[in-house]
């Protein structure tokens, strides 16, 4: 018995560890792991099926095959444990040691490790400073290398071909040593003095000036210093001993029919052993050189194939013509060790089945089929049966359960009570894809799911399946109940809005009972209270939709949060009173007194959650659902073809549009408009027409005329089924209704361009063959896209999770002073996102002042909840500074003050919340949803008509910002700058609307004018870009040569001629140098200057420009000289969307990116090169910056214009790296957040900004060293921000110069691979490369992230595991401190003295005590 305890003790867990280190293994280390040398390639004996001795499965080396039984059977059972059998040499122990005991092979000749040779950059190559080709020539015996030149004039490391070697031998005899093969490389590596090399490189780096050399030296220095610091020896990259994997990890399994299935590794090992043994034999025989060499080369190839098959040369194929899986293949890729077995494992106690709807369940319940429950809860049932004495043994209990007697069902009921189960639906895109429920036993074989959680799971009941898991331990049950229960997940983690919201038929039911109808039965009745209304309705005295007057009791929350009751009379619809019956006290009646669309219901639940708490909300949501189902059934809403009402004006609208199109075709034929313009205009006409038809249809469908009580005709909202469904938000949208009863409109081709001829029919009328054919185009693309994009989106999510996985809230407050400024997001005059939504749930970084009284409204560090955001709105404050994830200075992770509200819970985020993963899921989840939804509108082109004017939406005053204008003769202003804005301020002076004013817009108001809502204040042509005169004078053409740089086009009808500039590509050689431009001169033919400067009024004309004026014409200020046609965009849906988001997060440099001004100053143009223009910016202090800009780029600044640093000079998509470099971190964050949000906003998806900020923070983790100062960092090295901070703190203590850095932006893939943790990086992508680099550097992984801890099988350092890790670290820290104190206290002589005294002392207890003190 004592032995047994000892045995169990010896098999306890491995010791606690804090970090993992990866290093190169020295030959000694490999031998120390090994339990014996594998000498034979045999695996098992074909007759006895026992492993061969000294073979690949040898029991003597690797351990016994059966538990506690040696191979020959002499020793069996536990009592002989630990004995080594003298007959077969096998140790008597557990068979599972065959999973952990390794062997080794002594190689007859050293072999290079392929990873350090071929994985780029080649480590061996860098160390030796020899090219990879040369190393391969040496290794594969094509050349000699001089190892020791001796007294000869050969260079060390010089390569000699066979002939050269023989010549050298003749010339110098044996004064020099030259070798080939891995021995040569090994010797070269052994001769490297790493320390001296590092010193030499550092000195050389300081003296060198050339860029390329610096780069090369830095690369070498990095690798060498890595070897120096890690204690790896270079020669260990050459193998002399090869470890052999334990046999149970490369099994040989007998199949039926006498054949064997074997792991590929066995084949690879066999080849190595065969070749090694043959080589040994040849060496013993002193075989001729050429044969030995060939054998050595074959051995090298065999080892290469074993380590990483296919990396060099052709891969070794197995019997069935497929590549053999090598050791490297075992760990990399989706089916490799990391992703298949370590990051995700299959779990026991789980089942799956089809789901069906459970409308009678409560929110916290799920229906579990009895059959499944019985199987899942088996162990619990067994123990209960034994406890009750119904069964004596497990076997008896098993029998009872199999017979399914009544006592078993009773016990199952008990076991299941309050034992939560987890339900999961694949794909689990965010954390709401797994939730906990209390099981309710149901008959049948399908799981019943509560309808309200379908949104969270994205589930429907068309055959979806779900998996059930049982949390076994008490802790697991507790977590499931308190954190994962569906009732605790009412809010969406991505945006903080309720996700337990009724949808579809429930909404339809609620909408139906809250509608009112003119002249319904019982209209105008008065009731004393709500109960009376219910009785009247039940006795058919009053209709659901009748307008009635009722006295209701209303409880409203006061400031203190108590409910104050009051009575009042309300005039409302009877159905709303029925709904009011179930509304909890504390909600105002106004929230119910309206048709309950989906938005209204969401608002109702949101208000309930914020004001009355979770419990009330959950109960209320359930009641709403029951009521919605009930009345949706009562309403009898359905769809018939007659519900699709086609408007009568449709024909007229369409024929009008056709006339317009014909008119434009005429203009095109006569050359008045270009091909591009014609196309744009036609598409615009049809887009507008489609909207008009849709509007007519909506007017027709949404309103019906009825007679009221007096017999007069009145209009009321229609009860048309389709209208009700789309209006309530239950199903369908205006866009879909438009296709059913309006016109289908323009279609897109698969490449996104729009087909000019629209489909004028709708689905009610039916499509003809041509229209149907055009439709299939877009529809089919939608289907193809869906398949591709689901994968894309999943991959994006994976990268996001990987980059953010180690970001956890680690402290309450980091104490930073940095912050970001928040403003409402305004686009084209619409406030797309008001300030309240952007700052809700954040922490103020600076106090907010009342703009009128200058009093402090809100203090610094205030948490902005709904109430405080209302205060901001009341005082119309439009910019505040708030804390942000980007500026947080927490050492690891982030602090809760910088993050703000936990969106899924509604309070400030708790320490330990894994916000990185939440952010990644919130951004990734809609990606998948959206991609799956491209095809729903059947590829109908929804291109917005191009904006061509500014119409003010609110009354107020005009302010013109950064706007340069010139005044035309008629008195209008014309904008001649690009970055100008027109702002509308309300009477309080707060900004309501912002509009970008494009170049060339005519503005009809002045700065400070008052405007009324609906007034048009600016106009322009959206399809062309004008060039406008800023001075009056006479035109002169320069370099405009007919037939060379320009062509005349004459309009036959009007006789007008216009001039078109030809593109440089089409010009003859002589014309390529010419730069067509127009200049303005005065009466004396002298150049005129632009106002306020010495810059001549020259206007360069890009290719494709239309000139409307002739040479010598007189022009006024603000006239249009020329027009540059603009091409239109393709349709943008999330297709453009998903790749766009990926590009932003990958920080890719866009093609033809915008060119930004590197410094602030005045623009001028210098001498051009062949195909590039030269733009010079001169700063006020006289420094200049030159920029070469390709000729075809449209430069948006003119000579003499002043630009600010970071302003756009040449149009194009902006490059995030430029923004970071020129405008700083905050501007970059702002740019990425807005760009990503725009993509999602187009799809109507709400994501809170802070999630995107969290990802951006991770992309900005690294900095580039610009000046290393006194630190050990290298120039231009990329280092973690925190590491630089640490190094600098050390230097400051010594009064040295600190390192200077600049932030750099890494794309999410790069950032994931550049993370400090090599385990996390290796399990993400490019496993081989990551592990190679890590092992050379002897990297240490502190296991700070979530992934690393999952991989080593620990609790994650987040959530409930956070405190466990904190305690563990604290204990570890304490023991280190104690050790240090001990070391400080006792000197060696003191210890010696104490020890001798202790030994002398007679009482042994004291001696023990003294030793303890030591």
Curated annotation (Swiss-Prot):
Annotated binding of Zn(2+) 1, by residue: 70, 72, 85, 88
Keyword DNA damage: no
EC number(s) recorded for this UniProt protein: 2.7.7.6
GO molecular function: DNA binding; DNA-directed RNA polymerase activity; magnesium ion binding; zinc ion binding
Top-rank lineage group of the source organism: Bacteria
Keyword RNA-binding: no
Cofactor(s) listed: Mg(2+); Zn(2+)
Entry's Gene Ontology cellular component terms: DNA-directed RNA polymerase complex
Record field: compositional bias (Low complexity): 1392-1403
Region (Disordered) residue spans: 1392-1414
Catalysis: reaction(s): RNA(n) + a ribonucleoside 5'-triphosphate = RNA(n+1) + diphosphate
SUPFAM superfamilies associated with the record: beta and beta-prime subunits of DNA dependent RNA-polymerase (SSF64484)
Cofactor: how bound: Binds 1 Mg(2+) ion per subunit.
Entry binding sites for Mg(2+): 460, 462, 464
Gene Ontology biological-process entries: DNA-templated transcription
Uppermost EC category: transferase
Positions with a binding annotation for Zn(2+) 2: 814, 888, 895, 898
UniProt-listed InterPro entries: DNA-dir_RpoC_beta_prime, DNA-dir_RpoC_beta_prime_bact, RNA_pol_asu, RNA_pol_N, RNA_pol_Rpb1_1, RNA_pol_Rpb1_3, RNA_pol_Rpb1_3_sf, RNA_pol_Rpb1_4
Coiled coil: none
UniProt keyword terms in alphabetical order: DNA-directed RNA polymerase, Magnesium, Metal-binding, Nucleotidyltransferase, Transcription, Transferase, Zinc
Record function comment: DNA-dependent RNA polymerase catalyzes the transcription of DNA into RNA using the four ribonucleoside triphosphates as substrates.
HAMAP family: RNApol_bact_RpoC
Family: Belongs to the RNA polymerase beta' chain family.
Quaternary structure note: The RNAP catalytic core consists of 2 alpha, 1 beta, 1 beta' and 1 omega subunit. When a sigma factor is associated with the core the holoenzyme is formed, which can initiate transcription.
UniProt-recorded name of the protein: DNA-directed RNA polymerase subunit beta'
Provenance organism: Coxiella burnetii (strain Dugway 5J108-111)
Gene, per the UniProt record: rpoC
């Amino acid at each position: 018995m004592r032995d047994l305890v000892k045995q169990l003790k010896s098999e306890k867990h491995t010791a606690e560890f804090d970090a993992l280190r990866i290093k190169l293994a020295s030959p000694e280390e490999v031998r120390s792991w090994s339990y014996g040398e594998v000498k034979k390639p045999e695996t098992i004996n074909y007759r006895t099926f026992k492993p061969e001795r000294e073979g690949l499965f040898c029991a003597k080396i690797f351990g016994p095959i059966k538990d506690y039984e040696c191979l020959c059977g002499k020793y069996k059972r536990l009592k002989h444990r630990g004995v080594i059998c003298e007959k077969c040499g096998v140790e008597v122990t557990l068979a599972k040691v065959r999973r952990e005991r390794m062997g080794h092979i002594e190689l007859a000749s050293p072999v290079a490790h392929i990873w350090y040779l071929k994985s780029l950059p080649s480590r061996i190559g860098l160390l030796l400073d020899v090219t990879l080709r040369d190393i391969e020539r040496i290794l594969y015996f094509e050349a000699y290398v001089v190892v020791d030149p001796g007294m000869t004039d050969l260079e060390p490391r010089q390569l000699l071909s066979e002939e050269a070697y023989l010549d050298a031998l003749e010339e110098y005899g044996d004064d020099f040593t030259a070798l080939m093969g891995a021995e040569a490389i090994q010797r070269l590596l052994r001769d490297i003095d790493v320390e001296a090399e590092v010193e030499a490189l550092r000195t050389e780096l300081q003296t060198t000036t050339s860029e390329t050399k610096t780069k090369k030296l830095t690369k070498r220095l990095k690798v060498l210093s890595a070897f120096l610091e890690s204690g790896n020896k270079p020669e260990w990259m050459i193998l002399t001993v090869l470890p052999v994997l334990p046999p149970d990890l490369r099994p040989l399994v007998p199949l039926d029919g006498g054949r064997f299935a074997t792991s590929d590794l066995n084949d690879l090992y066999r080849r190595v052993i065969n070749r090694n043994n043959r080589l040994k034999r040849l060496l013993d025989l002193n075989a001729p050189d050429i044969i030995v060499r060939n054998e050595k080369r074959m051995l090298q190839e065999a080892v290469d194939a074993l380590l990483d098959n296919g990396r060099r040369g052709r891969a070794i194929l197995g019997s069935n013509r497929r590549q053999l899986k090598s050791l490297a293949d075992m760990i990399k890729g989706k089916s490799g060790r990391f992703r298949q077995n370590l990051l995700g494992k299959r779990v026991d106690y789980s089942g799956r089945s089809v789901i069906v709807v459970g409308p009678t369940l409560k929110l916290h319940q799920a229906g579990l089929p009895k059959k499944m429950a019985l199987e899942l809860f088996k162990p619990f049932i067994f123990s209960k049966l034994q406890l009750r004495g119904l069964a004596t043994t497990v076997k008896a209990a098993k029998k009872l359960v199999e017979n399914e007697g009544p006592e078993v069902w009773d016990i199952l009921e008990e076991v299941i009570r309050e034992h939560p189960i987890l339900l999961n639906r694949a794909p689990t895109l965010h954390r709401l894809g797994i939730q906990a429920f209390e099981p309710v036993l149901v008959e049948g074989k399908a799981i019943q799911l509560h309808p309200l959680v379908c949104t969270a799971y994205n589930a429907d009941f068309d055959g979806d399946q779900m998996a059930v898991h049982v949390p076994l331990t008490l802790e697991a049950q507790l977590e499931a109940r308190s954190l994962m229960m569906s009732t605790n997940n009412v809010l969406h983690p991505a945006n903080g809005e309720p996700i337990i919201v009724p949808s579809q038929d429930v909404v339809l039911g609620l909408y139906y009972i809250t509608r009112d109808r003119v002249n319904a039965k019982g209209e105008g009745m008065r009731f004393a209270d709500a109960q009376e209304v219910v009785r009247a309705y039940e006795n058919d005295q009053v209709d659901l939709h009748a307008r009635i007057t009722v006295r209701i009791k209303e409880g409203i929350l006061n400031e203190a949060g108590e409910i104050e009751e009051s009575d009042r009379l309300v005039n409302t619809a009877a159905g709303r009173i029925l709904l009011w019956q179930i509304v909890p006290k504390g909600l105002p009646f106004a929230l119910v007194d309206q048709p309950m669309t989906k938005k209204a219901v969401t608002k109702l639940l949101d208000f309930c959650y914020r004001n009355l708490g979770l419990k009330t909300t959950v109960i209320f949501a359930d009641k709403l659902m029951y009521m919605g189902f009930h009345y949706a059934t009562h309403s009898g809403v359905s769809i018939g073809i007659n519900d699709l009402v086609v408007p009568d004006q449709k024909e007229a609208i369409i024929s009008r549009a056709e006339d317009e199109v014909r008119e434009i075709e005429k203009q095109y034929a006569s050359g008045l408009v270009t091909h591009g313009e014609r196309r744009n205009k036609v598409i615009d006409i049809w887009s507008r027409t489609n909207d008009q038809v849709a509007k007519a249809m909506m007017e027709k469908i949404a309103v019906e005329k009825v007679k009221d009580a007096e017999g007069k005709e009145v209009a009321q909202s229609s009860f048309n089924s389709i209208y009700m469904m789309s209006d309530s938000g239950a199903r369908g949208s205006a866009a879909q209704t438009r296709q059913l009863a309006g016109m289908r409109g323009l279609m897109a081709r698969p490449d996104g361009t729009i087909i000019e001829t629209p489909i004028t029919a709708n689905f009610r009328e039916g499509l003809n063959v041509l229209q149907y054919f055009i439709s299939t185009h877009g529809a089919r693309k939608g289907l193809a896209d869906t398949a591709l994009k689901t994968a894309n989106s999943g991959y994006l999510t994976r990268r996001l999770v990987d980059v953010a996985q180690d970001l956890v809230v680690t402290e309450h407050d980091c104490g930073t002073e940095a912050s970001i400024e928040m403003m409402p997001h305004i686009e084209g005059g619409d406030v797309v996102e008001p300030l309240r939504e952007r700052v809700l749930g954040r922490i103020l970084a600076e106090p907010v002042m009342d703009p009128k009284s200058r009093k402090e409204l809100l203090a610094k560090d205030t948490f902005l909840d709904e109430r405080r955001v209302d205060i901001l709105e009341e005082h119309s404050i439009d910019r505040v500074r708030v804390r942000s994830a980007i500026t947080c200075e927490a050492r690891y992770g982030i602090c809760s003050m910088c993050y703000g509200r936990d969106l899924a819970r509604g309070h400030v985020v708790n320490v330990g919340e894994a916000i990185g993963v939440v952010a990644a899921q919130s951004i990734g989840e809609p990606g998948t949803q959206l991609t799956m939804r491209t095809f729903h509108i059947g590829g109908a082109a929804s291109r917005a008509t191009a904006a061509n004017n500014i119409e003010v939406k609110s009354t107020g005053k005009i302010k013109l910002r950064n706007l340069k204008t010139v005044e035309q003769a008629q008195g209008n202003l014309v904008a001649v700058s690009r970055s100008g804005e027109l702002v509308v301020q309300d009477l309080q002076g707060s900004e309501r609307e912002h509009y970008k004013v494009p170049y060339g817009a005519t503005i009809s108001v002045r700065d400070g004018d008052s405007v009324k809502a609906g007034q048009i204040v600016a106009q322009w042509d959206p399809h062309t870009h004008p060039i406008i005169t800023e001075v009056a004078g006479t035109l002169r053409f320069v370099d405009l040569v007919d037939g060379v740089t320009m062509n005349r086009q004459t309009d036959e009808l009007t006789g007008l001629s216009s001039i078109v500039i030809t593109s440089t590509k089409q010009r003859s050689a002589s014309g390529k140098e010419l730069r067509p431009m127009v200049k303005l001169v005065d009466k004396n033919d002298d150049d005129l200057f632009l106002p306020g400067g010495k810059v001549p009024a020259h206007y360069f004309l890009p290719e494709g420009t239309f000139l409307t004026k002739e040479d010598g014409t007189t022009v006024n200020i603000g006239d249009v000289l020329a027009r540059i046609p603009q091409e239109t965009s393709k349709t943008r849906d999330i297709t453009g969307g998903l790749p766009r988001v990926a590009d932003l997060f990958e920080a890719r440099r866009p093609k033809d990116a915008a060119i930004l001004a590197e410094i602030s100053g005045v623009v001028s143009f210098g001498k051009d090169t062949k195909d590039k223009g030269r733009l010079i910016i001169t700063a006020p202090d006289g420094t200049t910056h030159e920029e070469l800009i390709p000729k075809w780029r449209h430069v948006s600044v003119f000579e003499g214009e002043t630009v600010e640093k970071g302003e756009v000079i040449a149009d194009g998509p902006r490059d995030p790296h430029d923004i970071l470099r020129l405008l700083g971190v905050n501007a970059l964050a702002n740019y990425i957040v807005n760009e990503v949000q725009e993509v999602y906003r187009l799809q109507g998806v709400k994501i809170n900004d802070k999630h995107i900020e969290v990802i951006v923070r991770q992309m900005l983790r690294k900095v580039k060293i610009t000046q290393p100062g006194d630190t050990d960092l290298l120039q231009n090295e990329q280092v973690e921000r925190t590491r630089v901070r640490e190094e600098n703190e050390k230097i400051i203590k010594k009064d040295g110069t600190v390192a200077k850095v600049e932030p750099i932006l890494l794309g999410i893939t790069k950032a994931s691979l550049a993370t400090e943790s090599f385990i996390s990086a290796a399990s993400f992508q490019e496993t081989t490369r990551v592990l190679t680099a890590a092992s050379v550097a002897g990297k240490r992984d502190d296991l700070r992230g979530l992934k690393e801890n999952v991989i080593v099988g620990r609790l994650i350092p987040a959530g409930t595991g956070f405190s466990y890790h904190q305690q563990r670290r604290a204990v570890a820290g304490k023991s280190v401190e104690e050790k240090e104190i001990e070391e400080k206290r006792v000197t060696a002589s003191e210890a010696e003295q104490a020890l001798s005294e202790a030994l002398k002392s007679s009482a042994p207890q004291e001696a023990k005590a003294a030793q303890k003190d030591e």
